Structure formats: C-alpha cells, structure tokens
Amino acid sequence: MSVTAERKAEIIKANATKAGDTGSPEVQVAILSERINNLTSHFKTHGKDNHSRRGLLKLVSTRRSLLDYLKKNDEARYKALLEKHNIRR
C-alpha cells in the first residue's frame, strides 16, 4: 500500500522543479496521488476495510489542501498539475 523508495524517487525526479526538490507542492501532490491510487485499488478487493478508508480520507484531504494552496498562489502550475495527474476538481 505504501510507495516504495524506488518509486518515490522516480516520482520526485519526474515532478521536481529543480535538483533536490522534495517539498514543492507538485512533488507532494504526486506522491499523495500515488498513495491514493494504491489505496483505491486495495478497496476494490477489501471493501470493508474502514480503518484504511479513514487513512485514505486523510490523504485526500491533505492533497486537497496542497492543491488549494497552489491554486491560490499560482493557477498555471495548479492547472498543469491537475492535467498531469488526472485529478478531478
């Protein structure tokens, strides 16, 4: 369910705005989106796993907060991020 270190490194490399960038909203949203997608596929087989569902809701809320911040400060980056990760808004 969690993202492996190798996968996380790939995500960071693909979404970093500069070398060593791990804290930008784009990178954080990309990692959260990967975790959300993993949990979503988990729920296809484990529909009654309410403990993990709560964690999913927290991840979605955190991603939403980051997206709201990005929308408020730089709408072009926000729209590009939604497009890149196929996030519905």
Curated annotation (Swiss-Prot):
GO terms for molecular function: rRNA binding; structural constituent of ribosome. InterPro entries: Ribosomal_uS15 (IPR000589), Ribosomal_uS15_bac-type (IPR005290), uS15_NS1_RNA-bd_sf (IPR009068). SMART domains: Ribosomal_S15 (SM01387). Keywords: Ribonucleoprotein, Ribosomal protein, RNA-binding, rRNA-binding. It holds the Pfam family Ribosomal_S15. Signal peptide: none annotated. GO terms for biological process: translation. GO terms for cellular component: cytosolic small ribosomal subunit. Part of the 30S ribosomal subunit. Forms a bridge to the 50S subunit in the 70S ribosome, contacting the 23S rRNA. One of the primary rRNA binding proteins, it binds directly to 16S rRNA where it helps nucleate assembly of the platform of the 30S subunit by binding and bridging several RNA helices of the 16S rRNA. Forms an intersubunit bridge (bridge B4) with the 23S rRNA of the 50S subunit in the ribosome. Belongs to the universal ribosomal protein uS15 family. HAMAP family: Ribosomal_uS15_B. This is Small ribosomal subunit protein uS15. It comes from Bradyrhizobium sp. (strain BTAi1 / ATCC BAA-1182).
